[in-house]
């Protein structure tokens, strides 16, 4: 009986975040923390799932994965879709053993790490290896179709193809990977857990996503220009649009009467809900611009412009954080943390901070000098926030 394993890291969302679904450039960093999935063949034709802190689950073959507990849907969904895509079936039963150091509900892609690790194990077990970015795309399908979370492809790409110690530029149209970009020597980006749990399947994220696609459709209708991605526009182009073309907000019913639906299969427009469409579509356009500037700064950094470049880079993080709040993905705890970092300032080795991933809690990304870590620990204790920083 064969026994194989797959392993994949969580990721730190440096810039980009929820702009991925609008075709933005994002900058992602793999973590040291990983998830390992061990799959063992058994003679009994059944599926068994074990995970630390969860009750074991056993299913006969053919059970719909959507009938399983939510935590099981991630690995089972990967198996279900892998079997269909690769036309492969195990010879007997399978036992899945999951262990992970990636914290859950903290915005560092514990789900993507689990999906990618599962698919890597299945590659070994079946002898069928994915080419290109197919593994990441199948992992995203498991989360979208089986788990029911409307995430973009960013997390899975970062977990599958990121390089340790560097930022991976990903142009989410849908999966163009750039060359990794390193931070200057002595400077680190880390995750500071807020202690506030979040989930991509929750309403604020879904509302922001739907609002972005509604905004895109309104722009297309008002300008008579077809857009594949909203981020094909520049921030100045969006700002120049009139209230008539791109209103500040409108209800789902008014939008449907004006435009019908959106071209995003993962978004549902609720007729009675009011959507802040201008902010929702402006954020990814501006975030794409921030990510482009960040890559340019990091690739051109030198001893003579180091501090100035880091100061501008930090301001991009602060702008991104404010953008999250504008689309309903902020929270008081992360606002307090970011302002705490800002108060310490560049003179003490703190360049910038932002809420990351899906927002609404989770993890704050901090850009700082490595020597400033003790000061961040003191700030965390002062604010009564966690000190278990994520690297």
Label every PLM stretch briefly:
Residues 20, 112, 151-159, 354-363:
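Conserved phosphate/anionic-ligand binding catalytic regions in large, soluble enzymes, centered on
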Residues 125-172, 176:
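Glycine/threonine-rich beta-strand-loop-alpha-helix active-site module
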Residues 30-33, 108-128, 365:
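DPxDG-like acidic metal-binding loop motif
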Residues 61-91, 95-102:
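Hydrophobic alpha-helical hairpins/lids featuring a short glycine-rich hinge
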Residues 2-11, 36-73, 84, 166-354, ...:
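C-terminal nucleotide
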Residues 23-30, 208-209:
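Short Gly/aromatic-enriched secondary-structure transition segments
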Residues 84-95, 122-138, 370-383:
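Phosphate-handling active-site elements
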